[in-house]
């Protein structure tokens, strides 16, 4: 501990010496000793004077002067006021003037001759010539005076230019001196600040060292005192007492050792606490010094920045004053370069924009080309589809015509009992012929189709009469154009759900022609294709049905069923029928319908009936066909069995459901494209169009059903 105290004392002495050096430096800068602290009262007296406050001394002096009597007299206040005083002054002036006027009148002033001389108004020519001749001396004099004036002016000009240059130099020198003075002043301030900061730091160090020395001295005294106490035994109770026995024994020896251990532990703890306290005291000034150093660094940086700003401002001022052309040229060149760079940047930006616009235009063109190509492909594909459809229609027509010729030759041997079954189907014939009569106004060729349809339908219905009635199933509704027709069919004829795999497929194709003329020749199709819009046509392949067995059936069921259907269809046919026809057409239609239903006619009679039916009326045709067909259907129904009619009914109904579903899907998929490619729309005939659509679906169904029925009849006859 003695060594620690010595080191601390040495540090304290060094700190005192450094503090003295700092004080001397401060004294050199400020001219006074920082340790000399003047009292507060002396400062106040020096600032305020003898009065001790602001303005009090002057009042005391004034009072002293006024009391002494040697000073100026007190101001005498005029009680009358400013107006009275001004009026009195005016009066005195007037009185003085009045007194001086008579004195001036008494003294007479001497008269003086006027110096004004009247000049001659007109100068003669001689006078002017003489004046010019006499001016040679005047000219020389004027030249001399002019030269002197010019010389003086030039001298003044030179002096002014020199003076301006000198003034500029002086201003530059003064500015430099001012800058230097500011720098010196800042340096002095910085030095002074640093010195005072050093002084404060030294003073704090001295205080800490003094505290350390005091603590070290106290610690030494405590150690000396405790070193003496270690030799004694300390009691366990408090306050602790130290004692020494007169005679030592092993028990007392143990007590001495225990007390020494405890005292040594106390000494160690006290030393550790002392060292920690000294370390804390050293850490405080270190923190303060670090903060002060940081502040100094920040201040130095600020000073440097200010100096640099001052130098830059000084250079700018010098450039402005001297007007250096070189710098101006450089500035102009720099400005031009900047402008060029800006122009280059703008040009690059414009080029990029143009390139982007060109790319966009190219993309738009490519898209348009692709769209045009797609549209052309669609247009090319649509005519091909239409041509395929036409070819299929022609092939089907030829096949149907051949089959009809063969069937007419074979069916001549049918029994006459079939006439009775045709009578029961009279209402159905009337209903299905009515749409043909309604569509009669569209074209003359349609009635040929209706006549053929009647022939085929009569045979179909004759075979249906003998069939048993299956379970009715709801038929799905097609497009809204065919709703009235399908509702009537559902009332009169129930439909089966599924079709056996032996049935052939139906083809639904879109053709640009009215639907009732599917079975007509190609010569009739071409002119009507221009008149009507696009409609869907049902084409059926020639069906090949399996061998069917024959069973008898009762007549009563078929009669009641056919009559109920006939009533429903008669109601609809009456609302639509039109009364305009001729007697010759009616007779020909009756002969054609009777021949077709009884299968006793030939191909020549069918052609004559088709030509005559083109001019026939709806009402006469309905009546004649109903009478003949009813008698034939009744005669046929007697000779047919139960099972054969059931199987035929199933096949026909399934065909009808398939054709209606295919017709719907075909109309939804192909109707729009075929309408766009060919044909002109007839806006004024929407009702006729709907009727033609319904008629087309019926005609397709009738043709397929009639063919099936004929084949089944042939097979039955062979058996």
From Swiss-Prot:
Biased composition (Low complexity): 482-500, 578-632
PTM annotation (N-acetylalanine): residues: 2
Record PTM Omega-N-methylarginine, positions in chain: 54
Cell compartments where the protein resides: Nucleus speckle; Cell junction, Desmosome
Keyword Disulfide bond included in the entry's annotation: no
Coiled-coil intervals: 2-32, 163-234, 287-379, 446-467
Residues recorded as bearing Phosphothreonine in the entry: 124
Post-translational modification N6-succinyllysine, affected residues: 238
UniProt keyword Nucleus, yes or no: yes
Region described as Disordered: spans on this chain: 46-139, 280-719
Basic and acidic residues bias: start-end ranges: 87-100, 120-139, 280-316, 341-350, 359-379, 394-413, 453-467, 654-666, 673-693, 704-719
Annotated region (Sufficient for PSAP complex assembly), positions in chain: 221-284
MF (Gene Ontology): DNA binding
Disulfide bonds: none
Residues modified as N6-acetyllysine: 238
Family of the protein in this entry: Belongs to the pinin family.
Protein name per the record: Pinin
Gene symbol of the encoding locus: PNN
């Amino acid at each position: 501990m003695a060594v620690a105290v010595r080191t601390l004392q040495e540090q304290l002495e060094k700190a005192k010496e450094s503090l003295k050096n700092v004080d001397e430096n401060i004294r050199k800068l400020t001219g006074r000793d920082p340790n000399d602290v003047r009292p507060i009262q002396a400062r106040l007296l020096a600032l305020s004077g003898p009065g001790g406050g602001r303005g009090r001394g002057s009042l005391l002096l004034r009072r002293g002067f006024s009391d002494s009597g040697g000073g100026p007299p007190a101001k005498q206040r005029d009680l009358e006021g400013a107006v009275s005083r001004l009026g009195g002054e005016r009066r005195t002036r007037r009185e003085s003037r009045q007194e001086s006027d008579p004195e001036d009148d008494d003294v007479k002033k001497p008269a003086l001759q006027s110096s004004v001389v009247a000049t001659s108004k007109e100068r003669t020519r001689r006078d002017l010539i003489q004046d010019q001749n006499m001016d040679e001396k005047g000219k020389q004099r004027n030249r001399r005076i002019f030269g002197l004036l010019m010389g003086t002016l030039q001298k003044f000009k030179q002096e002014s230019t020199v003076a301006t240059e000198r003034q500029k130099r002086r201003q530059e020198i003064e500015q430099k001196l001012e800058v230097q003075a500011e720098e010196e002043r800042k340096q002095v301030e910085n030095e002074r600040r640093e010195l005072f900061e050093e002084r404060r730091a030294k003073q704090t160090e001295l205080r800490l060292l003094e505290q350390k020395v005091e603590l070290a001295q106290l610690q030494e005294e405590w150690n000396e005192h405790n070193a003496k106490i270690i030799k004694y035994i300390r009691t366990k109770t408090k306050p602790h007492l130290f004692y020494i026995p007169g005679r030592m024994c092993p028990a007392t020896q143990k007590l001495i050792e225990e007390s020494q251990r405890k005292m040594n532990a106390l000494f160690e703890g006290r030393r550790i606490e002392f060292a920690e306290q000294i370390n804390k005291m050293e850490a405080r000034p270190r923190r303060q010094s670090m903060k002060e150093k940081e502040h100094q660094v920040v201040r130095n940086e600020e000073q440097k920045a200010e100096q640099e700003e001052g130098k830059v401002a000084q250079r700018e001022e010098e450039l402005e004053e001297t007007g250096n052309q070189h710098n101006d040229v450089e500035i102009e060149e720099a400005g031009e370069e900047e402008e060029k760079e800006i122009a280059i940047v703008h040009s690059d930006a414009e080029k990029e924009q143009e390139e982007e616009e060109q790319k966009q235009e190219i993309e738009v063109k490519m898209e348009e080309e692709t769209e045009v190509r797609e549209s052309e492909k669609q247009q090319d594909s649509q005519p091909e589809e239409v041509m395929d459809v036409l070819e299929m229609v022609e092939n089907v027509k030829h096949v149907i015509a051949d089959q009809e010729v063969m069937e007419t030759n074979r069916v001549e041997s049918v029994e006459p009992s079939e006439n009775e079954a045709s009578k029961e189907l009279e209402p159905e014939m009337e209903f299905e012929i009515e749409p043909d009569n309604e569509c009669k106004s569209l074209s003359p060729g349609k009635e040929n189709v209706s006549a053929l349809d009647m022939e085929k339908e009569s045979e179909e219905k004759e075979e249906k009469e003998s069939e048993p009635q299956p379970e009715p199933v709801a038929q799905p509704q097609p497009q809204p154009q065919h709703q009235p027709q399908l509702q009537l069919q559902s009332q009169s004829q129930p439909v089966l759900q599924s079709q056996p795999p032996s049935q052939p497929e139906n083809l639904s194709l879109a053709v640009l022609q009215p639907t009732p003329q599917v079975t007509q020749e190609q010569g009739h199709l071409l002119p009507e294709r221009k008149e009507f819009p696009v409609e869907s046509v049902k084409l059926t392949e020639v069906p090949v049905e399996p061998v069917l067995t024959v069973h008898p059936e009762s007549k009563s069921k078929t009669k009641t069923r056919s009559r109920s259907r006939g009533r429903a269809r008669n109601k609809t046919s009456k609302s639509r029928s039109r009364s305009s026809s001729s007697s010759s057409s009616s007779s020909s239609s009756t002969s054609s319908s009777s021949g077709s239903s009884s299968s006793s006619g030939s191909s020549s009679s069918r052609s004559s009936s088709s030509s005559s039916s083109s001019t026939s009326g709806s009402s006469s045709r309905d009546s004649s066909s109903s009478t003949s067909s009813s008698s034939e259907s009744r005669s046929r129904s007697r000779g047919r069995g139960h099972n054969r009619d059931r199987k035929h009914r199933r096949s026909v109904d399934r065909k009808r459901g398939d054709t209606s579903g295919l017709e719907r899907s075909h109309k939804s998929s192909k109707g729009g494209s075929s309408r766009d490619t060919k044909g002109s729309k007839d806006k004024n005939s929407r009702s006729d169009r709907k009727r033609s659509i319904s008629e087309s679906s019926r005609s397709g169904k009738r043709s397929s059903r009639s063919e099936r029925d004929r084949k089944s009849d042939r097979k039955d006859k062979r058996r």
